[in-house]
C-alpha cells in the first residue's frame, strides 16, 4: 500500500506500531527542549502544556509530504508518549485549524480526555469557572473523530470508542459519492459492518456498558481528578527532592516519567536499552513494576535519524486509580532513591529473539548483561 505520513503530538506505542504495520510513517511533533526543561525549584507557576503539538513543525511536515499523503492529523490527550503531559485548548484549536486548512481530518486519541480537561481548567486562562464536562465538550468540538480506550478515563474494566463526526472531514474524505454528490458508500456504515462481522455486535455485556455509563461521569468529578493529579505530582516531587536526575516536571495526569539518559548521566548508549535494565532491577529488588517507553519500546534502533530525534527515552511510573496511599508512594520514592545510588550496577539489555517483530515489546525476548 501507499506510504502515508501521519503526524501527531505523540503517537502511543501501539498506535505507532499499527501505523508502521500498514506501511506508513508515524511522526511525533513536540518541543523536546521544553519537555526536558526543569523549572527553578522544581515547580512551575502554571503548567506549560508540554504535550502540545508543535504547530510550526506540523504545517511544515504537511507541506513537505503533500496534503494528499497525510490522511489525518492525530493528537493524543494527554500525551502519554511525551510523559503524560497535557495539551492546551489553544493548541487543540490551532492544530485542528491547520489540518482543516489542508482538508485533512483532525483526530484525537482521547484515552485521558478528563485528565486533559482538568489541566485546562486549572492552568489555561478563561477555563477556571467551566466544568470538566464543559471543557471536554469544547475539546471534542475541534475534532472530526476520536479513539479512546475506556479502561483509562472511562473508569471501566474494558471498552473503547471509535467515533466520527457526522459529515465531518473524515466522513467527506473516506466516503464514496456519485457524480451528483449522493453517498454511494458511507464510511461510518462500512466501519460498523466491519466491526459487527469481525467482533460481534459491540461485544460488550450489560455489566460493561453499565460500568462505562457510570465511569464516564465519575471521571468528570473535579475532586477525583485533583486527587489523582496530586498523587502524580507528589511522586515526582519526591524523586526530585531526593536528587534523582531525569524526573520530568511537572508530573503528567496519570503517572511520573524519568528520562533514562539523564538518570544514567548520559553514559548508556541507545543500543543498551538501559531503561529495560532499570525496569528489571526495580521489580527484582523492590517489587515495583514500571513501563519502559523509550529506546526499546519505541524501536529507536529501527527508526530514521529524524524519527530518532522524536523519541523520549523514558520509564513510566503509572499511578493506579483510587488505589494507592501516601505510604505506597513513599515506598516507591525510597526504592528508586536506593536504585539511583546504585545505578552503575544496573545491567544493560540485549534482544535475543524477535528484534524485528511488529510491536516487538510485546513479543521479543531480552537478557541482561553487565554494564562495563
Model-inferred region functions:
Residues 1-244, 269:
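Conserved PLP-enzyme active-site core in the AAT-like
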Residues 159, 253, 314:
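Extracellular structured ligand-interaction cores
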Residues 78, 265-274, 322-331:
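Short, conserved charged micro-motifs
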Residues 77-79, 112, 152-154, 252-254, ...:
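Glycine-rich beta-alpha junction loops
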Residues 219, 285, 297-372:
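PLP-dependent enzyme catalytic core of the Aspartate aminotransferase-like
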Residues 164, 258-261, 319-321:
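Short beta-strand-to-loop capping motifs
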Residues 200, 204-280, 284-311, 347-357:
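Conserved small-domain helix->loop->beta segment predominantly found in fold-type I
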Amino acid at each position: 500500500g501507499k506510504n502515508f505520513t501521519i503526524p501527531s503530538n505523540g503517537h502511543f506505542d501501539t498506535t505507532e506500531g499499527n501505523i508502521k504495520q500498514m506501511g506508513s510513517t508515524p511522526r511525533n511533533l513536540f518541543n523536546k527542549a521544553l519537555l526536558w526543561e526543569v523549572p527553578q525549584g522544581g515547580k512551575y507557576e502554571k503548567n506549560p502544556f508540554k504535550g502540545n503539538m508543535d504547530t510550526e513543525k506540523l504545517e511544515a511536515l504537511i507541506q513537505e509530504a503533500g496534503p494528499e499523503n497525510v490522511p489525518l492529523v492525530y493528537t493524543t490527550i494527554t500525551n502519554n508518549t511525551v510523559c503524560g503531559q497535557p495539551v492546551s485548548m489553544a493548541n487543540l484549536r490551532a492544530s485542528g485549524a491547520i489540518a482543516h486548512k489542508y482538508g485533512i481530518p483532525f483526530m484525537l486519541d482521547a484515552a485521558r480526555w478528563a485528565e486533559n480537561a482538568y489541566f485546562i481548567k486549572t492552568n489555561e486562562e478563561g477555563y477556571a469557572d467551566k466544568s470538566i464536562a464543559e471543557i471536554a465538550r469544547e475539546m471534542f468540538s475541534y475534532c472530526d473523530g476520536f479513539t479512546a480506550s475506556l479502561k483509562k478515563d472511562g473508569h471501566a474494566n474494558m471498552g473503547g470508542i471509535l467515533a466520527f463526526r457526522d459529515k465531518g472531514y473524515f466522513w467527506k474524505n473516506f466516503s464514496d459519492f456519485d457524480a451528483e454528490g449522493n453517498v454511494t458508500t458511507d464510511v461510518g456504515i462500512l466501519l460498523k459492518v466491519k466491526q459487527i462481522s469481525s467482533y460481534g455486535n459491540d461485544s460488550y455485556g450489560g455489566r460493561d456498558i453499565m460500568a462505562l455509563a457510570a465511569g464516564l461521569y465519575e471521571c468528570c468529578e473535579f475532586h477525583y481528578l485533583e486527587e489523582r493529579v496530586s498523587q502524580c505530582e507528589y511522586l515526582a516531587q519526591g524523586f526530585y527532592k531526593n536528587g534523582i536526575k531525569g524526573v520530568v516536571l511537572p508530573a503528567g495526569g496519570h503517572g511520573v516519567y524519568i528520562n533514562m539518559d539523564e538518570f544514567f548521566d548520559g553514559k548508556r548508549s541507545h543500543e543498551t536499552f538501559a531503561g529495560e535494565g532499570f525496569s528489571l532491577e526495580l521489580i527484582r529488588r523492590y517489587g515495583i513494576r514500571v513501563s519502559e517507553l523509550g529506546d526499546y519500546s519505541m524501536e529507536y534502533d529501527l527508526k530514521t535519524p529524524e524519527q530518532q530525534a522524536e523519541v523520549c527515552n523514558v520509564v513510566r511510573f503509572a499511578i493506579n486509580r483510587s488505589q494507592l496511599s501516601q505510604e505506597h508512594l513513599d515506598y516507591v520514592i525510597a526504592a528508586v532513591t536506593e536504585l539511583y545510588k546504585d545505578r552503575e550496577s544496573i545491567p544493560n539489555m540485549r534482544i535475543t529473539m524477535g528484534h524485528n517483530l511488529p510491536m516487538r515489546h510485546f513479543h521479543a525476548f531480552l537478557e541482561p548483561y553487565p554494564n562495563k
